């Protein structure tokens, strides 16, 4: 645990230095076609320790009961839920969310992954010490539910500018970026399209640290847009631990 303790010291220094800086509002956007992850969405939104935030959800499945979803979030005045026909692509749904956003920063989050309490704060702080317009994580933890294994993917791309890729569920960017680029009008690779357009236009991207986010790899590939088996993805990762308590490794 020495490595995480060293990181904790560094990250806490940054938090302390920037604690009195103005924290702009953030519009969290996500799409879902499954109601079974609504509890996870709820828990992530509650957990994230960031004062000025809103959540915009697009239901991209005609069979989902929108009223059921509204009732789930009835205690929030900063959550809005829309329903868009399932024939509309994921990229189009995300671009729709951006148009609805009332804040100047957009955070794309996934419905089934894990986000720690300081996830958004640490990501927003990066804008204070870089000139990047797009922030995210390349190095990131992966939890394999099938095996109870916590692993690390892309460990070499961390705390540096990047022109390659960022994990799709961790994208945080200035809303003004969408004056020049959009998510791709596709169901797979909509974020890759955005990165490519950013590179073409000289929009800088920065990969932050690996902490406070976990990509949850489910046993059933139908639960994922990206159809890759657990064994194949695991072969691309570095195993950290066999554990049912991944939070102790990833939360700072």
Predicted stretch roles:
Residues 1-46:
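N-proximal low-complexity "stem/linker" segments adjacent to membrane-targeting elements
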Residues 84-101:
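Glycine-rich, basic loop-to-helix element that forms the pyrophosphate-binding segment
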Residues 106:
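Short aromatic/hydrophobic "clamp" motif used to bind/position activated sugar donors
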Residues 138, 205-213:
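Catalytic beta-strand/loop signature of glycosyltransferases that borders the donor
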Residues 188-196, 203:
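Acidic donor-binding loop at a coil-to-helix junction in glycosyltransferase catalytic cores
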């Amino acid at each position: 645990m020495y490595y995480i303790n060293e990181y904790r010291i560094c990250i806490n220094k940054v938090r302390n230095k920037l604690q009195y800086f103005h924290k702009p509002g953030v519009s969290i956007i996500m799409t879902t076609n499954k109601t079974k992850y609504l509890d996870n969405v709820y828990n992530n939104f509650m957990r994230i320790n960031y004062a000025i935030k809103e959540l915009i959800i697009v239901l991209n499945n005609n069979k989902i009961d929108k009223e059921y979803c509204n009732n789930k979030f009835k205690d929030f005045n900063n959550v809005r839920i829309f329903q868009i026909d399932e024939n509309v692509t994921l990229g189009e749904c995300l671009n729709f969310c951006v148009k609805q956003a009332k804040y100047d920063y957009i955070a794309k989050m996934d419905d089934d992954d894990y986000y720690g309490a300081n996830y958004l704060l640490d990501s927003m702080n990066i804008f204070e010490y870089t000139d990047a317009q797009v922030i995210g994580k390349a190095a990131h933890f992966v939890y394999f539910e099938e095996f109870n294994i916590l692993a690390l993917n892309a460990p070499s791309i961390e705390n540096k500018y990047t022109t390659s890729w960022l994990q799709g569920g961790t994208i945080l960017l200035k809303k003004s970026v969408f004056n020049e680029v959009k998510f791709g009008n596709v169901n797979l690779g909509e974020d890759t399209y955005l990165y490519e357009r950013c590179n073409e236009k000289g929009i800088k991207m920065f990969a932050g640290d690996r902490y406070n986010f976990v990509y949850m790899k489910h046993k059933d590939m139908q639960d994922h847009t990206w159809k890759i088996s657990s064994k194949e993805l695991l072969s691309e990762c570095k195993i950290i631990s066999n554990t049912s308590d991944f939070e102790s490794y990833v939360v700072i």
